[in-house]
Structure formats: structure tokens, C-alpha cells
Regions:
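Extended recognition/assembly regions associated with phosphoester-bond processing machinery
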Residues: 1-401
């Protein structure tokens, strides 16, 4: 069975960075769908953290209708991530009421109506495709497992908002990530935080502190992706330039101290390094640890979450083929990241299409052989992908409200 996996669509993003809201950018994906038997949407399909779900649903409907027609009776599998964990929250709540229930496994397969009314609506729009739900992931082949990858935040050494939130929850519950050995362990510390984030956005638009803008601004100040010079260019006066530099210097000097304090508080282990290289390495280390702890060693593990596709041609494959969890033991997981379908402008510096964060990633899994990373939007320019380039009707489409 030929399976195409895509991840991190974030349909309904308040920044309009979600490219699949735009018909002309759906075409390459729909063409690829014509040659496969199954499509897996590997989490963060909807952006449910920026505002009420109705906004994301309105944006998502044309995509699901077109995808359903393209599949024409073939299978669509929907996997929840951290930004759309609410898609399976009702099922988790019902499950908690049962007197006898098996522990969460690596694959729970559900019909849409079992997962939530939200998923049932998406499945209806996707007809005539046959929609199922998998959580936290699914076995594509006996040697290929796919999941969104949000559990990696429990082990990430980069102090993102998500990592700090999970770390605080782990500390509060007295469940250190170093002891995790099952899906249930990860769900116990992540699900409460996800529920809180979704609750904040249920009736109002979330602010910058919670929708990622704060993290982006801090990363820019710390010099990520050459943003220091860009920030200086944006400063329109000598005074604003001076203030911008003073703010940046304060963040740069205070950042290691803040990280050290978080480590002393038991939120870590964290590192005071946020370069692009460290973002990649830290994400792979963390995902490799998740794979080892839940028993995926030696398999191919397809994931998303970090938005960083790979391995790419210039990547060191040794970073992606994780070492054994125990010296001399079974080999570690072989990681493949499906990338994203969002315009993450902060990561798209340099020549067009050269960034590993360039959107349009997909992973093709055939009946045998290694999963193949595909990049379906390499022929598009940054100007064509920018939200500012959207056609009139799409540019005026309201975000979550």
C-alpha cells in the first residue's frame, strides 16, 4: 500500500502562514495524492490554539473537500498533534470513564465519530474518502511507524515555550521524563497542558505570548537565522535602533542565567543554545529518546512537529539514525521528518528553497524500501509562498475568531 504522509498543516493559523488554505498551493499535493492508496495527515492539521475552532474549520473545509475528492474512496488517516489534540480529547475522556481499559498502545485506531464531533465533521467533508483516526500514531508497515512527534518536547534541551510547559507539568506531577517507558507516561504530562492551551483559545483569540510570536521574537533577539541584521534594518531611526540593540543585549546576557535557573528549578535539562544546528540536533536527540523509551528501536520513525524536513542531502545521516539506547544493544530508530506546510518566515532566510524548513514536505512509504522524503513546493519562490501573495478572496478569508 503506497502511503503519503504530510504533517503540520496548521490550517486556520491567525498569521495565514498555512499554505494549504490556498487553492494554487494545494495542487501539487493533490497531484501526488493521485498515485497513492492512503494519505496520512500526521498531526497539527488544524490550528486550534489561535482562536475558536470555528475559524480553523472554515479554513480547513475546502482542503478536506478537495482531498476527499482526490482520494475518491481511498483511505485518509488523521493523527492528532499538540496544536489539535482537542480532536481526540473527547475519546480520551470517555476512555477514562471505563472500568476496565487497556493501557494506551502505540496505535489506537478509531472511527471519526468515536474521536470527536470535530473529526466527524472533517470526515464528512472528506467524503468519499474513508477516514479513520490513529493516536498517537500508526504502523504504516511492520517496520515503519508514524506519529506527530509532540512527545519529544519532554526531552528537548531547547527552552521553547512548549518544552517549559511540559517540564513544569512533569515537575508538578512528580513524573520526570527520565522515567518514561510508555505512551501513557507521555500522555499523562502532555495532555493536561494541551487541554489548558485549547481552553484558552476556545472563546477568544490567543495573544502573542501563547501563539508562538513571543518565542519567535526572543529567537530573533538571540541571533537566530541572521535576524540581528534584519532587525537592525527594520529599525527606522537611530533611537529605535539603539533601543532594539539594548533589548537584544539584555536578552542575550540574561538568557544563560534564565536557563540555569530553570535547570536548578528542575524544569530541565536545558541548554542555552538556540542555533539552527542545535534546533536540529536537539529535536533528533529528543525524538530518538522517545522512540527508544516506547520500544521503536530499529524501525523507521516518520514524524513532524519540528517543521524541519530531513534527512536532506547535506545532513549527516548519523544524526538521523539514532544510536542504541544501551551500548551494544539493539540499534536505534531511523528518523525521517516530513517537514511542514507553513510559511515560517523566520527560518526561510537565504536563497529560495534552500532552507530545510522550506514548506511542502511529504514522505512516501511504499511496500518495501526506505521511506522517501519528497518536497513538493521546491519550484515555488518565497514571494509566491508568502501570505502576502494570496489571491484576493483567500487574503480576505478571516482567521480564527
Amino acid at each position: 500500500m503506497r502511503t503519503l504522509v504530510i504533517s503540520d498543516l496548521h490550517l486556520g493559523s491567525s498569521s495565514r502562514a498555512d499554505l494549504l488554505r490556498r487553492g494554487e498551493l494545494r495542487e501539487p499535493l493533490l497531484c501526488a495524492v493521485a498515485d497513492v492508496d492512503r494519505v496520512v495527515l500526521l498531526g497539527d492539521v488544524l490550528e486550534l490554539r489561535h482562536g475558536p475552532a470555528r475559524g480553523a474549520l472554515a479554513i480547513a473545509r475546502p482542503f478536506f473537500e478537495e482531498l476527499g475528492r482526490a482520494l475518491d474512496g481511498r483511505e485518509l488517516v488523521l493523527v492528532a498533534g499538540n496544536h489539535d489534540h482537542a480532536l481526540i480529547d473527547p475519546w480520551l475522556a470517555v476512555r477514562a470513564e471505563l472500568e476496565q481499559v487497556a493501557p494506551l498502545a502505540l496505535e489506537q485506531l478509531l472511527e471519526p465519530h468515536e474521536a470527536s464531533p470535530l473529526v466527524a465533521r472533517l470526515a464528512q467533508w472528506a467524503e468519499p474518502a474513508h477516514t479513520r483516526v490513529a493516536y498517537p500514531g500508526l504502523w504504516i508497515r511492520p517496520d515503519v511507524y508514524a506519529m506527530h512527534g509532540h512527545y519529544l518536547d519532554c526531552h528537548l534541551t531547547v527552552p521553547t515555550i512548549e518544552r517549559l510547559s511540559v517540564g513544569a507539568m512533569s515537575r508538578l506531577l512528580g513524573r520526570p521524563a527520565q522515567t518514561f517507558a510508555s505512551v501513557g507516561d507521555y500522555e499523562a504530562v502532555t495532555a493536561p497542558m494541551y487541554a489548558w492551551r485549547h481552553a484558552l483559545a476556545r472563546d477568544a483569540i490567543a495573544g502573542d505570548a501563547l501563539n508562538g510570536i513571543g518565542t519567535v521574537n526572543a529567537w530573533r533577539a538571540l541571533g537566530g537565522a541572521g535576524e540581528r541584521d534584519a532587525a537592525d534594518r527594520r529599525a527606522s531611526s537611530r533611537r529605535s535602533l539603539l533601543l532594539a540593540r539594548l533589548r537584544r543585549e539584555a536578552i542575550v546576557r540574561g538568557f544563560p542565567l534564565a536557563v540555569a535557573a530553570l535547570n536548578r528549578a528542575g524544569i530541565g535539562p536545558l541548554r542555552a543554545e538556540v542555533s539552527l544546528g542545535e534546533l536540529r540536533r536537539a529535536g533528533l536527540r529528543a525524538m530518538g529518546e522517545v522512540a527508544a523509551r516506547v520500544g521503536l528501536g530499529g524501525r523507521y520513525v516518520v514524524f513532524g512537529h519540528t517543521h524541519r524536513a530531513g534527512p536532506l542531502g547535506d545532513d549527516d545521516v548519523r544524526e538521523w539514525n539514532r544510536p542504541p539506547a544501551i551500548a551494544g544493544g539493539a540499534p536505534g530508530a531511523r528518523l525521517i521528518n516530513a517537514g511542514c506546510w507553513t510559511y515560517d518566515s523566520i527560518f526561510l532566510s537565504g536563497p529560495d528553497a534552500e532552507s530545510p524548513y522550506w514548506p511542502g514536505g511529504a514522505v512516501l512509504v511504499e511496500d518495501s524500501g526506505p521511506p522517501q522524503l519528497q518536497r513538493l513546493l521546491l519550484d515555488r519562490t518565497r514571494a509566491e509562498l508568502s501570505p502576502r501573495h494570496a489571491s484576493g478572496a483567500e487574503a480576505l478569508t478571516p482567521g480564527p475568531a
